[in-house]
Amino acid sequence: MKRILFSPLGDTDPIRDCHDGACLHILRHYQPERVVLFYTKDMENKEQRDHRYTRAIHKLSPNCAIEEIFSGIVAAYLYEEFSKILPEAVQSVRDRYPEHEILINLSSGTPQMKTVLAMLAADTERCRGIQVPSHSGKSNRKNKPASDDVDVDILLEVNVDDEEGAKNRCEEPPLSVFRYHAEKNRIISLIHAYEYNAALTLAR
C-alpha cells in the first residue's frame, strides 16, 4: 500500500545532536511518497526564515511531495487548540488519498499534539502511529536544539543517521490502550442511554 506521512514539527526537527529528528527518520525508513507537514506558528516562522524543514526533506528524498498546513497556533501547549484541527486535518488526508496508508509521527510537536495524534492513530482506519526514540534512548531535554542560525545543509552533512548501517529507531507502539478506553466509554454511554443490546454487541 502507498504511504503518506502526517507529521507535526518540533524542536528536534529536522536534525538534533547530529541525528535525524522524527520526521526525517520516518521518511528515511518508510519512504512515503508524500509528507503532510503540520506547523504551529513557531515552526512556521522557522520554516519561512530558511526553509529548514522542506530543504531537509528534499535533500533526503528529492521526489517526495510536500503539503503544508500552517495552523497559526501560538498556544501549542493547550489541548483545545488541537482537539478539532488535528482530527480534521488527518481526516482530510484520508479522504483525499483513499488508497494510501497514513503514517502518523507521534514523536514531534508538543505532548498535547502527540496525545491527540496517538488517539487518532489508535482509532482511525488506515492510520499507523510511529514513534522515534532519541538516539541515546534517553530524553532529549539535555540536548539543546541546533541554533536557528545554523545552516540546515551543515547539519545534514554531519548527520550520523545518513551513514551506512545506522540504526533504524522507528517503533510502532501498541496503541490498543487508547482503543480500549474509547470502547469502554462508548459502552458506558450506551448503558446510560438504556441501549443494552447495543452495549452488549459492542462489548462482544
What are these regions (language model features)?
Residues M1-L103, Q112-R204:
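Long, low-complexity, Lys/Arg-enriched
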